[in-house]
């Protein structure tokens, strides 16, 4: 195959997914509104579940929820059958993703939730599936054409599920008037944290600031540098900054330390 065809194939796959993703508008109905309300008014824990690709998507959406102040975590349905079911309690809300809705590994988790009256939001593409039959709120995903040569590999369908999860999160964010200031509280690390950081977040002020009057001597300056542990001292003259002295300056001025030489 000519390498020039690579770009053509990639564009074709991307354009197909873009076309299929427009079907997301079919999901914005009564069930979507019910899901938003259930998430916002949940008095317990918000727990995401899914197996395979759907499980990876559920993990990502759970991470998005937590990063914007909607506490949640992921529970692997397979592990749940081996003891992790104890994480799920009556006031919790389960949000389970499965494209087919008939993944057998979901069976025990669904039975457990139904037995104890735990609310389930099910997300699947088949209305008569195991998942949607067991769910209190049924979000029916539109059928989409996968973008791979076989038409079977989860591509467009996984993108659609991811988009739905992001739409749930952003709708709640808008409703709660989520701001950059709030986001900074939950996402202080990485490039996002750096972008949201303000000078006041790292600024040293008040009693923590190493300052000394210009009439003091080098010995006193050294003492303050050692106490404040910032490697510098700010020299003030009539409450205005006259200069800075670093520990390096003091090392170079060692001959003055034995004297009562004024900093001035």
What annotation goes with each model-predicted range?
Residues 236, 241-242:
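Short hydrophobic beta-strand segments in globular cytosolic domains
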Residues 5-41:
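An N-terminal, well-structured beta->alpha segment
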Residues 17, 50, 95, 168, ...:
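Terminal peptide-recognition signature
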Residues 1-12, 51-59:
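Short, compositionally biased "basic patch" segments
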Residues 211-229, 254:
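The conserved cystathionine-beta-synthase
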């Amino acid at each position: 195959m000519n390498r020039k065809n690579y770009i053509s194939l990639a564009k074709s796959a991307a354009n197909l997914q873009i076309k299929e993703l427009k079907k997301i508008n079919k999901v914005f109905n009564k069930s979507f509104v019910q899901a938003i309300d259930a998430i916002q008014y949940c008095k317990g824990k918000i727990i995401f579940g899914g197996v395979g690709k759907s499980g990876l998507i559920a993990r990502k959406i759970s991470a998005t929820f937590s990063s914007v102040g909607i506490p949640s975590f992921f529970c692997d349905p397979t592990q749940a059958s081996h003891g992790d079911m104890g994480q799920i309690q009556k006031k919790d809300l389960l949000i389970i993703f499965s494209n087919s809705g008939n993944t057998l590994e979901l069976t025990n988790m669904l039975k457990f939730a139904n037995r104890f009256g735990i609310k389930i939001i099910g997300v699947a593409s088949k209305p008569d599936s195991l998942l949607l039959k067991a769910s209190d709120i049924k979000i029916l995903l539109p059928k989409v054409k996968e973008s791979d040569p076989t038409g079977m590999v989860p591509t467009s369908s996984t993108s659609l599920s991811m988009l739905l999860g992001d739409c749930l999160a952003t709708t709640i964010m808008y409703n709660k008037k989520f701001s950059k200031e709030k986001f900074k509280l939950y996402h202080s690390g990485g490039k996002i944290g750096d972008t949201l950081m303000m000078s006041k977040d790292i600024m040293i002020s008040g009693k923590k600031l190493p300052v000394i009057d210009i009439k003091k001597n080098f010995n006193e300056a050294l003492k303050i540098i050692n106490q404040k542990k910032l490697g510098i001292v700010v020299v003030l003259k009539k409450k205005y900054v006259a200069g800075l002295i670093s520990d390096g300056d003091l090392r170079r001025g060692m001959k003055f330390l034995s004297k009562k030489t004024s900093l001035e």
